[in-house]
From Swiss-Prot:
Family, similarity comment: Belongs to the morbillivirus/respirovirus/rubulavirus M protein family.
Record GO terms (molecular function): structural constituent of virion
Encoding gene, per UniProt annotation: M
InterPro entries from the UniProt entry: Matrix_C, Matrix_N, Matrix_Paramyxo_C, Matrix_Paramyxo_N
Protein name: Matrix protein
Location relative to the cell: Virion
Function: The M protein has a crucial role in virus assembly and interacts with the RNP complex as well as with the viral membrane.
Gene Ontology biological process terms, A to Z: virion assembly
Residue ranges crossing the lipid bilayer per the database entry: none
Pfam family, one: Matrix_Paramyxo_N
One term under GO cellular component: viral envelope
Keywords: Viral envelope protein, Viral matrix protein, Virion
Subcellular location, principal: virion
Superkingdom assignment: Viruses
Length: 353
């Protein structure tokens, strides 16, 4: 049997049961009705319980805009601090560093950051962060924090259109998401490799089914019913291509054997919000290994794969319920990818790079 459309192989539950779950952030308020800060840590690759650890840190919180003073009031009002009010929610990824302190010290330092925010636009809408008041606990991340940081607005802000352009905006950190990295590294497949097309090859893609503790339908993420009748979401990631000698047929059984030999283990982390981590503990074919730059651990941040889904579920519980390998014929090389709506060289349309 040859593969002409798509074939599916379902991984055993044991491949994701150990670390395929993320606990939700507890959304609690104190007596002043202010959100209580909290730190959440996911562990990938058996990191050390004590001493120095490598932590990827992702800050979550609220955008707050400066209140406008009333035109009419007393003279004393001219010197009063108008304060800030919430105008949206978002995040600030500050990356990976070696950390020796404890979790609560890191949380306290993060909540004391003074972060100014500006909304702007280049090729895409961007959010600009400028950070002050960096405490010693955050010095491992200082090389990034001390410089201005820009991110795609649709990746770090739930509703960037709500951020005003004519007022001062601050980002107040409430939650800290950490991914503690052990023996596994944070490797992401290069875009050139992920976009690779080779003739007479089979593309191995992974479809990851998840359930989450938040209602997503009202936010534009429609859930579907799985085989058990339960609501679930799914997303896809690209693993790589496999190739046989010229003239040999690709069968479902052949592809299945290749996948089973890799002995893939799946975990969920908090890199960029929610992230999928794939660890190949078995043997990998030479063709596929070269595409992975001979790495065995791959990180897929949902922030890059599906930013809107990531924005909706990054504070909730997330659990892997099923993982499928999808075997599909590789796209022909003559197929072109059009990242822009306006295509070059079509009629009277011209585009200058």
């Amino acid at each position: 049997m040859s593969i002409t459309n798509s074939a599916i192989y379902t991984f055993p539950e044991s491949s994701f049961s150990e670390n395929g779950h993320i606990e939700p952030l507890p959304l609690k308020v104190n007596e002043q009705r202010k959100a209580v800060p909290h730190i959440r840590v996911a562990k990938i690759g058996n990191p050390p319980k004590h001493g120095s650890r490598y932590l990827d840190v992702f800050l979550l919180g609220f955008f707050e805009m400066e209140r406008i003073k009333d035109k009419y009031g007393s003279v004393n009002d001219l010197d009063s601090d108008p304060g800030y009010k919430v105008c949206g929610s978002g995040s600030l990824p500050i990356g990976l560093a070696k950390y020796t302190g404890n979790d609560q010290e890191l949380l306290q330092a993060a909540t004391k950051l003074d972060i100014e925010v500006r909304r702007t636009v280049k090729a895409k809408e961007m959010i600009v962060y400028t950070v002050q008041n960096i405490k010693p606990e955050l010095y491992p991340w200082s090389s990034r924090l001390r410089k201005g940081m820009l991110f795609d607005a649709n990746k770090v802000a739930l509703a960037p259109q709500c951020l005003p352009l004519d007022r001062s905006i601050k980002f107040r950190v409430i939650f800290v998401n950490c991914t503690a990295i052990g023996s596994i590294t944070l490797f992401k497949i290069p875009k050139s490799m992920a976009s690779l097309s080779l003739p007479s090859t089979i593309s191995i893609n992974l479809q990851v089914h998840i359930k989450t503790g938040v209602q997503t339908d009202s936010k534009g993420i429609v859930q579907i019913l799985d085989e058990k009748g339960e609501k679930s979401l799914n997303f896809m990631v690209h693993l790589g291509l496999i190739k046989r000698k010229v003239g040999r047929m690709y069968s479902v059984e052949y592809c299945k054997q290749k996948i089973e030999k890799m002995r893939l283990i799946f975990s969920l982390g908090l890199v960029g919000g929610i992230s999928l981590h794939v660890n190949a503990t078995g043997s990998i074919s030479k063709t596929l290994a070269s595409q992975l730059v001979f790495k065995r651990e791959i990180c897929y941040p949902l922030m890059d794969l599906n930013p809107h889904l990531n924005l909706v579920i990054w504070a909730s519980s997330v659990e892997i319920t099923r993982v499928d390998a999808i075997f599909q014929p590789s796209l022909p090389g003559e197929f072109r990818y059009y990242p822009n709506i306006i295509a070059k060289g079509v009629g009277k349309i011209k585009q200058w790079n």
